[in-house]
């Protein structure tokens, strides 16, 4: 929303004037994409919001949503990290994406972007969405540009869905509760996923918790 837009601008302001003697520590977690909102040049804020809403409603997995977000943002896809130069940068990541790809958590604001503009265009085409002209013009105008942002930085994954599930499983079993862990790779529209999980619960042993 507008608050996220203002916050992203202020964040970039804090990074001005850094030197190579400075150290920037970033804490990035799932949900950061929605909070860190600053559209790329020539994309109205409402158009970026519209694209995000359409991708969520059509059931696109978070990996695809974040791939598109990275190419429509002035801070995602490594651009926040590039703004930290020439300072040293270390990112602490709490991952909510299957596989814990750091470039996808919160759309990787401090991690070099490994996806291409053509990837974002392919995702939008696959779902046959009515994309605002400003977004299409921005993406098509970037296709021939060299992909990726080069800067030096390090990162550590300090928490993830997988470690959270294992901790919950261990805690439950320590209290005599038998559980079934479905893993951290489940993606899709919550309504559909919820139905699938409910069916599984009904089939499971009554003494187990899912």
Segments and roles (model prediction):
Residues 15-21, 27-28, 64, 73, ...:
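Solvent-exposed alpha-helices and their adjacent loops that cap or buttress functional pockets
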Residues 39-50, 82-86, 111:
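A glycine- and small-aliphatic-rich helix-loop capping segment at beta-alpha/alpha-beta transitions
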Residues 33-37, 74-75:
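Short glycine/serine/threonine-rich phosphate/pyrophosphate-binding segments
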Residues 1-21, 63, 68-69:
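Glycine-rich oxoanion-binding loops at beta->alpha junctions
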Residues 56, 62-128:
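A glycine/threonine-rich phosphate-anchoring loop and its flanking beta-alpha core
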Residues 87-90, 112-196, 203:
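Accessory alpha-helical/coil subdomains and C-terminal extensions
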Residues 41-66:
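Short, acidic/small-residue loops that bind anionic groups at enzyme active sites
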């Amino acid at each position: 929303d507008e608050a996220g837009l203002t916050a992203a601008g202020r964040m970039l302001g804090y990074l001005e004037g850094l030197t190579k003697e400075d150290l920037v520590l970033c804490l990035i977690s799932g949900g950061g994409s929605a909070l860190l909102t600053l559209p790329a040049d020539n994309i109205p804020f409402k158009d970026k919001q519209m694209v995000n809403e359409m991708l969520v409603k059509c059931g696109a997995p978070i990996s695809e949503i974040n791939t598109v977000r990275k190419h429509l943002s002035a801070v995602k896809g490594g651009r926040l990290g590039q703004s930290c130069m020439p300072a040293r940068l270390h990112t602490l990541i709490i991952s909510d994406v299957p596989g814990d790809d750091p470039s996808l958590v919160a759309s990787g604001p401090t991690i070099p972007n490994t996806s291409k503009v053509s990837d974002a265009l392919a995702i939008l085409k696959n779902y046959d969405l009515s994309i605002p002209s400003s977004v299409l013009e921005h993406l098509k105008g970037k296709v021939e540009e060299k992909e990726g942002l080069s800067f030096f930085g390090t990162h550590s994954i300090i928490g993830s869905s997988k470690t959270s599930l294992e901790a919950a499983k261990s805690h439950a079993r320590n209290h005599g509760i038998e559980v079934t862990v479905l893993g951290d790779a489940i993606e899709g529209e919550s309504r559909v996923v919820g139905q699938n999980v409910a069916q599984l619960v009904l089939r499971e042993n009554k003494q187990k918790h899912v």
